[in-house]
């Protein structure tokens, strides 16, 4: 059951773990699109909502914080197009604030942390938040040596050659600067230059660009620096990384020093001493925003004193001494021409509004997500009303559309004054528009609440689900078959020729054999050719042996993301052991079921989804045919020669004082142990810290070896 609409307080620990798994996967996907490909597909507001949901879950269930948690990372992994650069100091992101109350809370938290009274004034800087690409530029002995993108905050992309083409960035600094200087700032494209570039593209009959931010990022990632040079990119300096000697002791003075060294700095930056002044400057910048020749999406506030910044320090991914006050998303009015239903891999029916084209924030918008059936009716994910009942969205309505840097914006509200009498309420389909199967809304057995998503029950007989499943199967983190992308999958799926048809995963691996005796050769079809077909067959054959976690992930089991697949592979070791365990766990009781639930990071929601998947004969039959073609490799185990805990199952409970829970888990796994989240007959060791409760009691009841943290350290160190 989906819990994404449920209040955090109502979730069980298993439901929270399942949702954190989903959020980690979903946020990582959007990070990769935004930071790695410059192709965001959701709005900033929706992205921020995902992050806030993740933070709320982690605050309530701190023991569930994952190693791949979005709260522990910045941006996306660097691409492989450019060589990697490890930042001398991490490039962290900023926490966001969205209201005056949020800003007041931020300032109050600074005063509290420093033990300052309100009458002991602390100065802040306030400057526009440029909507561009973050950059770190390193100078040694005054000469530009390296320029790198933010990447994941630790490692970025080397774009030095392209940065040298930006006229505003000096290649040589004045005499007397520190030996090592890292200037950080934002590369952007001016609005006027963006419009001129699009006029040029139109004149040449080429596709125009979406927005200045994406265009700047794409221009900076050109393999040919001449292309970058032609794009007239610009730069604002506002921060620093490694600095061998600090030329000033305040944020404001540091930025003014950058200006003296020849860097452009934003003229709207101010030093202010009160919340009222900060908010007034925010409003002032907001009023100037339409007339600026560059895009901004908020105002950044920083504690001015570098000494106080040092005392305030950092959280895991952001400084305590800074925040970004975001502007509201841009809005416009247009008409809903049609509501269409898309069917995804898991059968979810997602409504999309086709809009009368409208320009919002410099981008032509023709589609808007409607999320689900309830959203159309004005009901939020938690069952709360987000619009008056009569403000349901209908075909023919005039609506308010919001866009915040996304490709598919969202509809906020209906303009009732413009609703025509003949406009009728939208009837959400109860039958899948693709396969004709029933589409149902499940009820969460624990909360009794209806799931906000309606799903097709057709499974693999539904073409939409089948094609999306195949696309998932060949995706990068699954089988990763080069040359078999979305368009190719659609071609093979729709083809009626038995020698070309691919409708299940095993048929990918029989394609070459079927083609040998066919009169219809793939190489003779437009879009393929002999060379590309040869490469496709080679890519397919390269995947006849595959890592176990990739195989499990590729199966497309609901709730089983890449991280969960790795946990399962590490726990079971072989596919045979995994499949046997799933079958033995079918009664939802017994040792196999308990062992599955005991795996750290696997809760009842995920476990139930896996067991249900293996109960379906069609799934078992398809996997059987797949195993005739493919061999999942045994999961790699850490080298643990001489380890006293190799092969043992360990449970940590209570408070740990010398390690964080993640550190203890990582250390145990590096020594060959399996870390479980609950105690069962197969548990070998329970490490109990202060506050240990029911897990320790159960361990004693079962006769499992127990020890405190010091005894555990002595064991693994001996």
From Swiss-Prot:
- Swiss-Prot/TrEMBL catalytic activity: NAD(+) + (deoxyribonucleotide)n-3'-hydroxyl + 5'-phospho-(deoxyribonucleotide)m = (deoxyribonucleotide)n+m + AMP + beta-nicotinamide D-nucleotide
Source domain of life: Bacteria
Where in the numbering of this chain does the BRCT domain appear? Answer: 640-718
Q: Which cofactor does it need?
A: Mg(2+); Mn(2+)
* Record CDD domains: BRCT_DNA_ligase_like, LIGANc
**Residues the entry annotates as binding Zn(2+):** 432, 435, 456, 462
Residue positions binding NAD(+)? 44-48, 93-94, 127, 150, 186, 302, 326
Would I find NAD among this entry's keywords? Answer: yes
GO CC annotation: cytosol
Gene3D superfamilies membership? 5' to 3' exonuclease, C-terminal subdomain, 6.20.10.30, BRCT domain, DNA ligase/mRNA capping enzyme, Helix hairpin bin, Nucleic acid-binding proteins
- The record's active-site residues are 129 (n6-amp-lysine intermediate)
Task: Tell me the first and last residues of the signal peptide.
Answer: none
Instruction: Provide the E.C. number(s) assigned to this enzyme.
Output: 6.5.1.2
Please list the GO biological process terms of this entry: DNA repair; DNA replication
Enzyme kind, highest EC tier? ligase
Q: Does the keyword DNA damage apply?
A: yes
The alphabetized UniProt keywords are: DNA damage, DNA repair, DNA replication, Ligase, Magnesium, Manganese, Metal-binding, NAD, Zinc
Q: Which GO terms describe its molecular function?
A: DNA binding; DNA ligase (NAD+) activity; metal ion binding
**Which Pfam families does this UniProt record tie to the protein?**
BRCT (PF00533), DNA_ligase_aden (PF01653), DNA_ligase_OB (PF03120), HHH_2 (PF12826)
Q: What does this protein do?
A: DNA ligase that catalyzes the formation of phosphodiester linkages between 5'-phosphoryl and 3'-hydroxyl groups in double-stranded DNA using NAD as a coenzyme and as the energy source for the reaction. It is essential for DNA replication and repair of damaged DNA.
Q: Which family does it belong to?
A: Belongs to the NAD-dependent DNA ligase family. LigA subfamily.
The identity of this protein, by name, is: DNA ligase
What is the phylogenetic placement of the source species in the record? Bacteria, Pseudomonadati, Pseudomonadota, Alphaproteobacteria, Hyphomicrobiales
